[in-house]
Amino acid sequence: LGLMEVHFVAAAWQAVEPSDIAVCFREAGFGGGPNATITTALKSEGEEEEEEEEEEEEEEGEGEEEEEEDGEEEEEAGEGEELGEEEEVEEEGDVDTVEEEEEEEEESSSEGLEAEDWAQGVVEAGGSFGGYGAQEEAQCPTLHFLEGEEDSESDSEEEEEDDDEDEDDEDDEEEDDEVPVPSFGEAMAYFAMVKRYLTSSPIDDRVQSHILHLEHDLVHVTRKNHARQAGARGLGHQS
C-alpha cells in the first residue's frame, strides 16, 4: 500500500462499515458461498466452539453418572440410620411417659399459686403501660416532626444524585459522538493482520491477486467513508 492509501485508512478507520468489508471479502472470493473457488483447511471459529461445547456436555454427563452412584450409596446408608433411629425412638418413648406423669403431678399442685400470681401480674402491668402511654403521647409531635425532616433531606439528596447521573449520561453521549482517528501504525498493523490471516496456508499467484484486489477494495471503501465523514463534519460546523 502507498502512503496516501494508508493515510485514508488511518483517517477513516472507525467509519468503515462492517457490511462493506464483508462485500469486499465475498467479491474477492473469500466467503464460502456457492461461487467460491478458494478453500482453506482452517476450521472456522464456530466449528471450534461447537466441538468445545460437545466435549463439555460429555464431561457433564460423566459427572452426573458419578453423582447418581454416590446418591444410591447415600440412600443405602440412610436406610441403616433410619432403622437405628426407630429403635432409639422406642426407648425414648418409655422414658417420656414416665416424665409426663411426673409433670402432671407438679402442675396439679401449682395451679392455685399460678392463678394468684397471674392476677397480681396483670394489675402491675396495667399500671406500667398506662404511664408509658401518657409519656409517649407527649413525645409524639416531636417524633413526627423529626421524621418529616429526615424524609425531606433524603428526597433532596436523591434529587441531587439524579441530576448528577443525568449530567454524566450527557457527557458520555457527547464522548460517543466523537470518532477517534487511529494512528499510522495502527492502520498498518490492521492490514498486516489481514494479510497474515489470508496467507496462513500455502497460496498461488491467483490467490495472491485476490488478496491485492481485496486490499484495493478496502482502500476504496475507506476513501468513500472518509469523504462521507468529512462532509458530515463540515455540515456540523456550518450549523
Curated annotation (Swiss-Prot):
Highest rank taxon of the organism: Eukaryota
Gene Ontology cellular-component annotations: chromosome, centromeric region; nucleus
Gene3D superfamilies linked to this entry: Dimerisation domain of CENP-B
Region (Disordered): 28-185
Compartments where located: Nucleus; Chromosome, Centromere
Segments for region (Homodimerization): 176-239
Phosphothreonine: residues bearing it: 37, 39
Purpose: Interacts with centromeric heterochromatin in chromosomes and binds to a specific 17 bp subset of alphoid satellite DNA, called the CENP-B box. May organize arrays of centromere satellite DNA into a higher-order structure which then directs centromere formation and kinetochore assembly in mammalian chromosomes.
Assembly notes: Antiparallel homodimer. Interacts with CENPT. Identified in a centromere complex containing histones H2A, H2B and H4, and at least CENPA, CENPB, CENPC, CENPT, CENPN, HJURP, SUPT16H, SSRP1 and RSF1.
UniProt protein name: Major centromere autoantigen B
Species per Swiss-Prot/TrEMBL record: Ovis aries (Sheep)
Gene: CENPB
